[in-house]
């Protein structure tokens, strides 16, 4: 086990289909529990972009880079987890086949690309177009740019909350929210230097200050403040929308710095400011069972220490584990009798 006196490194993660992804300093691990109760693990080295390009690690810039990275990584990990789950894939549509042939790309890459484009369009539609239309309506009534900006910002927050509530009504999404809770509990366990076990992890809350849900809320609030000073007097709805889009990387960059600052501070002011983000997570996390925590623990250990030695593999190359204990750093798989001969 790791040295209990060492300060734990920051590690983040994401809930996926029937599992959890964890991202360590230089690797990503995804653990998925299949219907037969076994767990399969995908492990990839992942060097931060800031190591290759120092400027990407600069304050503000790193936040904008992180936003793009979150979107891309989120889609790719969900796609990987779907494959790892072992469920039958849907037959590609004629359009997907045609597009793959025209672009010279695999159908999987085309489907993922289309999904990413749709996700971006949905986000822009919900959180930029609709609020801009609300602002346009307020301006047409003779309200000031300041009032219109405040109404637009409030609309964004309400849409975000409504979207999360709606998602929580879907049974499969609720289960994913449980894995989200498992991710947070495991991260807390790691941060407190406790042995990673379901029993230890269960004692922690599902609400974590560095969660992406809190980041989204901070983005909304920072954008409201920024747009009170930039572009508030623009009456043309299309131009206001364009200005908001162009400033999105700046908003994301500032929001990232605020999130990190609040998460690592124990001052009374920081606790008060991060409270709304923690409460919003009640919509995107649920209490996990021990099996879900096992998946999160495996991903945590593998992301930090690598795959177990001599782990059996699937045909696709994923490691097969039956217990979270098999992922502990010093664990060595026992040899079978026939292997000893």
Place the predicted regions along the sequence by residue.
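Hydrophobic alpha-helical membrane-embedded segments
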Residues: 58-80, 151-177, 248-264
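Transmembrane alpha-helical segments and their cytosolic interface motifs
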Residues: 107-125, 204-229
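Juxtamembrane "helix exit" motif at the C-terminal ends of alpha-helical transmembrane segments
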Residues: 80-84, 119-144, 219-243, 252, ...
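Cytosolic juxtamembrane amphipathic/interface segments immediately preceding
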Residues: 2-10, 15-16, 50-57, 96-112, ...
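Short, charged cytosolic
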Residues: 31-32, 42, 66, 70-101, ...
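Hydrophobic alpha-helical segments characteristic of transmembrane helices
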Residues: 88-138, 144-170
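Polar-ligand-bearing catalytic/cofactor-coordination segments
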Residues: 2-12, 16, 20-22, 138, ...
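Divalent-cation
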Residues: 1-86
């Amino acid at each position: 086990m790791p040295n209990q006196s060492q300060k734990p490194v920051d590690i983040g993660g994401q809930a996926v289909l029937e599992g959890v992804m964890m991202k360590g300093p230089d690797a990503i691990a995804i653990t998925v529990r299949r219907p037969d109760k076994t767990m399969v693990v995908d492990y990839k080295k992942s060097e931060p972009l800031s190591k290759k390009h120092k400027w990407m690690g600069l304050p503000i810039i790193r936040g904008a880079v992180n936003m793009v990275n979150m979107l891309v990584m989120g889609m790719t990990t969900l796609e990987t987890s779907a494959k790892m789950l072992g469920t039958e894939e849907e037959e590609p549509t004629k359009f997907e086949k045609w597009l793959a042939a025209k672009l010279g790309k695999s159908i999987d890459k085309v489907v993922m690309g289309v999904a990413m484009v749709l996700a971006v369009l949905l986000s822009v539609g919900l959180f930029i177009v609709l609020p801009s239309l609300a602002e346009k309506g307020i301006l047409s009534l003779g309200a000031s740019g300041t009032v219109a900006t405040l109404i637009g910002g409030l609309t964004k927050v309400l849409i975000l909350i409504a979207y999360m509530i709606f998602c929580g009504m879907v049974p499969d999404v609720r289960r994913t929210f449980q894995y989200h809770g498992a991710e947070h509990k495991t991260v807390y366990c790691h941060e407190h230097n406790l042995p990673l076990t379901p029993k230890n992890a269960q004692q922690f809350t599902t609400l974590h200050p560095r969660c992406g849900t809190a980041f989204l809320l901070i983005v909304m609030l920072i954008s409201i403040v920024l747009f009170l000073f930039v572009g508030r007097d623009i009456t043309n709805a299309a131009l206001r929308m364009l200005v908001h889009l162009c400033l999105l990387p700046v908003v994301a960059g500032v929001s990232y710095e605020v999130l990190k600052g609040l998460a690592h501070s124990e001052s009374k002011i920081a606790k008060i400011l991060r409270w709304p983000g923690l409460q919003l997570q009640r919509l995107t996390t649920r209490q996990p069972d021990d099996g879900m925590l096992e998946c999160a623990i495996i991903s945590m250990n593998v992301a930090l220490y690598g795959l177990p030695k001599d782990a059996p593999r699937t045909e696709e190359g994923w490691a097969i584990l039956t217990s979270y204990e098999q992922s502990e750093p010093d664990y060595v798989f026992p040899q079978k009798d026939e292997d000893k001969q």
